[in-house]
Amino acid sequence: ENGLTEEDISILDSNELKKKEPNLTCHSGLYCTKEASTNYGMLTNAITNLAKKNKINFLLRHNVKYVEETSKDVNMIFSDNSTLTANFVINCAGGNSLDIAKKFRLLKGYSDLHFRGEYWVANSDIADLVKTNIYTVPRYPEFPFLDPHWIKRANGETEIGPNAVPVDSPEAYDSFITDIPTVLSKITDIVTGSTKKLLLNTDFISLVSKEFLS
């Protein structure tokens, strides 16, 4: 489905990997002969333009304040007090998906945690230490999505990351806190919702503290 065959992937020992990447030290690894690096900004713009050609409209900066449901349709009222009426809604709002689901009175027993991934651009003297993407074995098996890797970008830069800085909302791109009400609401969700058990997980607490300091 992703364009790879069994011949494209192999398990190599440390000596075999050393021949391909002299600066890499490991016991063994999965080696893939094919890889891709994507400029996600260009990809997003291309998909957006294609969608617009097919008469799809984008409503930017329209946060959903609340939802009104009738027997026939759904009215979504946005932060600017405009309204969108639909008879079928697909919720694929990324980090805001759970919040929107709750406006439909769904998944009330669930809560979520948000992390911001940050990348470091490697200096020129170390950018070419390896020629390919390197993914490490997760330090915390329960949270394999929070381990950094070595990435060769489409623009030629080499980056190391991401880390996973805990933040209060999906839009906290440059700070830790967007606003106090959001923070208080998130704390309440954590304490009363399904994520409260993470507060007793020593691996999770250790990971969060290290990532915050990074």
Enumerate the language-model features and the residues they cover.
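Flavin (FAD/FMN) cofactor-binding core of flavoprotein oxidoreductases
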Residues: 10, 14-19, 37, 111-116, ...
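Low-complexity, flexible helical/coil segments
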Residues: 14-22, 44-48, 65, 93-95, ...
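Short amphipathic alpha-helical segments at helix-loop
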Residues: 28-32, 81, 201
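Charge-dense, low-complexity intrinsically disordered segments
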Residues: 34, 80, 207
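Flavin-dependent oxidoreductases
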Residues: 67-179
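Contiguous C-terminal substrate-recognition/catalytic subdomains in enzyme active sites
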Residues: 155-158, 163-214
